[in-house]
Each structure stands twice: as C-alpha cells, then as structure tokens.
Amino acid sequence: MYAIVFDLDQDSLAQTYHNDSYKNAYGDIKKALEAHGFSRQQGSVYFGDVSKVDAVSCVLAVMDLAKSNPWFAPSVSDIRMLRIEDNNDLMPAVKKAVS
C-alpha cells in the first residue's frame, strides 16, 4: 500500500490561498487526492487504494495537486510517498494498556 503524507506551512498558506478561509485548502487537497484513489487516514496522511494506487499514481496525484492548486507548491513544506507493508491498528493495545 502507498501513502502520501505532507505538512503545510500555515503562514504561507494564509498568504497564498485564494480566499480568507485558508483552512479550506485541506478540503481541496482531500478532493484532489480522492480523485486519484486516496482516502484520508488522519490529519495530512492519505492511504492509496491497494487495487488502484502504485508509485507512479502517487507521483501523478501530487503533480496534479500542485498543478491545479497554485497555492499548494509555495505552502507545502514537506511531502513524501511512503510504501506501507502492514497496516495494523494499535488501538487494542492502547485500550489494553489502560484497562
């Protein structure tokens, strides 16, 4: 499974986003990545659908995101593609530790 993770510089985003409500940028990103087979896992972490997303589609999704949103490139401070071998939910361990 592939994932895209990123950080946005909030000051830069506030200056470059096309309206005053720059937090809407996260919704724009979500919509763009969903169109390429990704779903939001948490925060700025998106997992690709195993049956649709490979390394090339990660690159194409990010290129499309940057091309269609002129505020994205100047605002993104870090963005990475990750290959995830296992996706294990650790919440049972957390709950067991405090019970």
PLM features: what roles do these ranges have?
Residues F6:
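Active-site flanking residues adjacent to catalytic metal/cofactor-binding acidic residues
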Residues Y2-A3, D11-S99:
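Basic nucleic-acid-binding interfaces
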